[in-house]
């Protein structure tokens, strides 16, 4: 069943992403693996290098943002954005040639969806089975999948923020005895999400992620680690041994 947008748009984008993920250039595959994503994970996620389809996108806003065929992101990493049940709801494009740039396109109804990067729908089955959930900021911080227990799930929120949809999803699907591990960056933004903060304009307390989750009955632990600003940086400094030392796993 196609939940979120028109059949022709979903078919066009699905075909384009499948083509982009097939026969990856060696340098692209090496880049993704070198950033720490396990091979199983990046293949399950359908990460590719965008190849412009021969036909134009049926979505007008996609054409305006990226060109009729996606010419403006040709060769960029293409990362499907899926709902927890595996339906395609958008795409993220990311440069990998040394320049930093990220561009996103979401279907209109994706606003109702908890937009985590992850191995959907496999991750949902693991959550149903009682696995813990580890949430990081960036997609390459998901390298911690190399060291957490196999039964657990690693997800990325694409930044230091948990939406209402994220919280509702976690509260609904996590098992009562499972734990949520907030593993945001070791910077001010990450710490504010962990501890909460006072809004400068309103002077009101803004709840951190642990407090928000605890209010809906979810056990939340803030992951403490050393040796880098974020898991991706720790990976680049020393691979799996550095991650294990930093996280004591």
Predicted regions located by residue number:
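TOPRIM metal-binding catalytic domain and adjacent DNA-binding surface shared by DnaG-type primases
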Residues: 1-78, 82-85, 174, 214-215, ...
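Short, functionally important structural connectors and interaction interfaces within domains
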Residues: 5, 9-10, 16, 29, ...
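General structural signal for secondary-structure boundaries
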Residues: 6-10, 14-15, 21-27, 38-41, ...
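Residue-level preference for alpha-helix termini and adjacent loops
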Residues: 30, 44-46, 76, 95, ...
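TOPRIM fold recognition
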Residues: 32, 130-133, 139-249
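Residue-level signal for pocket-adjacent positions within structured domains
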Residues: 40, 100, 110, 226-229
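Short, solvent-exposed coil/turn linker segments
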Residues: 49, 80, 123, 228-230, ...
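Phosphate-handling DNA/RNA-contact segment within nucleic-acid enzymes
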Residues: 53-177, 194
